[in-house]
Amino acid sequence: MVRINGQDCEKAGISVSDYLEQENYNVKHIVVEYNLEIIPKEWYAQTILKDGDEVEIVSFMGGGC
């Protein structure tokens, strides 16, 4: 199991890039924390999710007055 945004998922064996595409994330507006480290967007395709990994995906939103 991979823990993504606090939920256990059966996503081991796919890349971060593939996961983001499956879930329709816009990679221009997110940051991925992989096992407590922010990873560069260039690493998304080569970073393969493994059992025990912890991933947090943070989206940026504009706002203000």
List each model region and its residues.
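Ubiquitin-like/PB1-type beta-grasp interaction modules and other compact soluble beta-rich domains
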Residues: M1-C65
